[in-house]
Amino acid sequence: SCTSKKDSNIQATIDSLSIYDNHSTLEISEAKHLQWVDSVLGVKGVKLIDYRNGIYQYDDTRFYWNRTFGYFLVYPSSFTHGKESDLGNGNHFVNEDSTICLNVYATYFDVFKDDYSLREWFDMMIDSEIEQGYRITKKDITDHSYTIEGNTKGGRCFYSKATCKKTYERDIILTVKLEYTDSKKEEARAIICLYNNDKIIAKELH
């Protein structure tokens, strides 16, 4: 499982608060929606997989489009997508036997800018991972992002990348986290290469 019992309890609480459920149904025809998607992305032939959960496909590329925070995440088409969080900030994806779990989520950073520098905020995020039992063996911090790798409390490998980006005129921090068993290291490295090459995109939408 990709979530701890604590996370599940939090999710159950959020689930009971329907005020937070900001997912709209598709009120125009699918064809009209896809015409708009094509125009936004500058391509032709995007297919809709799951509107509520933001899943689309272009050729053989499956991607998650988070409309609330304006970012895209390319992920392996063989993975099963989950439900977009009720806060609308992310989603999760798993391979067939759940030996690889992929999570992506966004948070607003600009609301904290008066109190913390980005570096201080990154340090707090990393400290939070350590407090949750993650053992970090590799850490790389730049002016606008950090990458950490290591092992989870349960003995899985993990990779996490957080990047500060601007979208809808807001500063957000976008986090991608991958947890995988040692036997799936090769497959996981291929996915990690995608995100190291920035196949996670925050795009200004109008």
Go through each PLM region and give its residues.
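Conserved polar/disulfide-associated segments of primarily extracytoplasmic proteins
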Residues: 10-25, 33, 84-173, 180-186, ...
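Conserved short hydrophobic patches within well-ordered secondary structure
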Residues: 174-175, 195
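N-terminal "mature-domain start" segment
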Residues: 14-25, 29-45, 49-87
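Sec-exported extracytoplasmic/periplasmic mature domains
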Residues: 80, 127-130, 196, 200
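Generic detector of isolated residues embedded in canonical secondary-structure elements
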Residues: 1, 77-78, 194
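Short, low-complexity, Pro/Ser/Thr/Gly-rich segments in the mature regions of secreted, periplasmic
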Residues: 192-206
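Bacterial signal peptide processing site
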Residues: 3-5
